[in-house]
A protein has these predicted regions:
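Extended helical coiled-coil dimerization/tether regions that scaffold
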Residues: 232-298
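Broad gene-expression machinery/nucleic-acid interaction feature
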Residues: 4, 80-84, 110-112, 125-127, ...
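Short, solvent-exposed polar/charged micro-motifs at secondary-structure junctions
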Residues: 94, 222-224, 283-287
Length: 345
């Protein structure tokens, strides 16, 4: 089941006011001419990714709030991003069922998340934010079907009640102090407690775990070719891929390693094996080819080989992100290599 079920951008970038939601499946391929809005859709996904950590920073780095708003006829004053997310994918706990662990047994299968923002001078201001049951749209009492609602600056959250040291499945309606909340940051960045606010926390964690790869830099002096610090994250490939060595080292010690080598042998006829080396607090990776006495370091591998390995490592990860977004992954690859990756996608 895909984590994101749909995405709607309204009054944002090239998406005019009144834009319809875009349904999403397990695999989504965007094809269109230059300027058709493919990159803008990816920008919207990156906004979701930034919500739990730094929405204001993401808006600022994109040129400021006014640059994000629709600039066509009848210029938009408010931009809205809305998505529906699959409930069960939020709460996966090893060894126990998600509903048993969190005490959540009466949820519908889909949540709806919506955030609206406008420009306040040079700053961004959040004007609306809602987390609710997807099936409860239009309820006579919208508060009863929501887990958080901005309510025109009078925010309300439904928190799980606590009986002693035990969490229950009952909800308590809490009115938050608006002066204690930052007006340019999402509630996902300000309320984080998996037991008291499981829906907010679960959605925020999944948004943060999403990965987007847009700037492919495989030049001779690229960071991913150099010895990489061993203390970088090893759970998922970073957007700039500077932890590729650590990801490959993790993959080497997983059940997916044999499949990784199988794909590399189909990609490189001379491929013999792949290895990583940890020394001096850094990680390096090497390619061994038949007929060669010494392995080939990352600094000498071709751009296409590095690109194929990076994509392969991400697609074979034992703990994949809830969403992987790749912009033009086919660049620099032989058509035969694209066919190999297509089967994994």
């Amino acid at each position: 089941m895909p984590f994101l079920k749909s995405l709607r951008l309204d009054g944002i970038l090239s998406f005019p006011p009144g834009s319809e939601p875009i349904p999403l499946t397990g695999l989504n391929v965007l094809i269109g001419p230059n300027g058709s809005g493919k990159s803008n859709l990816i920008e919207g996904i990156e906004l979701l990714h930034a919500l739990p950590t730094g929405f204001a920073s993401a808006i600022r780095e994109g040129g400021g709030a006014r640059e994000w708003l629709w600039k066509g006829e009848n210029t938009a004053r408010v931009g809205t991003i809305e998505t529906c997310v699959e409930y069960l994918s939020l709460f996966k706990v090893v060894g126990r069922s998600s509903t048993e662990t969190l005490g959540l047994i009466h949820h519908p299968p889909i949540f709806r998340y919506r955030l609206a923002f406008s420009a306040l001078g040079q700053r961004v201001e959040i004007t609306d934010e809602v987390i609710e049951d997807e099936t409860k749209n239009g309820d006579l009492d919208p508060d009863s079907s929501s887990y958080y609602r901005f309510k025109k600056g009078n925010p309300i959250v439904h928190a799980r009640s606590v009986n002693g040291l035990t969490n229950t499945d009952r909800r308590e309606k809490r009115v938050l102090d608006p002066t204690a909340l930052k007006q340019d940051e999402s509630i996902l960045a300000q309320l984080k407690d998996s037991f008291v606010y499981p829906e907010l926390t679960g959605i925020g964690q999944k948004f943060e775990q999403m990965r987007g790869f847009r700037e492919w830099s495989f030049g001779r002096n690229g960071q991913l070719r150099q010895p990489q610090p061993a203390d970088l994250p090893s759970e998922a490939l970073l957007p700039d891929m500077r932890n590729l060595g650590l990801i490959l080292n993790q993959l080497e010690h997983s059940s997916a390693w044999a499949e990784f080598n199988t794909y590399l042998s189909r990609f490189l006829p001379r491929f013999q094996r792949f290895s990583t080396l940890i020394v001096g607090g850094t990680v390096q990776f090497f390619l061994h080819e038949a007929g060669m006495k010494m392995p080939i370091p990352a600094t000498r591998l071709s751009d296409g080989t590095i690109r194929f390995m990076a994509i392969l490592a991400q697609l074979l990860s034992p703990t994949p992100p809830p969403l992987i977004c790749m912009e033009e992954p086919e660049l620099g690859l032989h058509p035969d290599a694209i066919a190999l990756l297509a089967s994994l996608l």
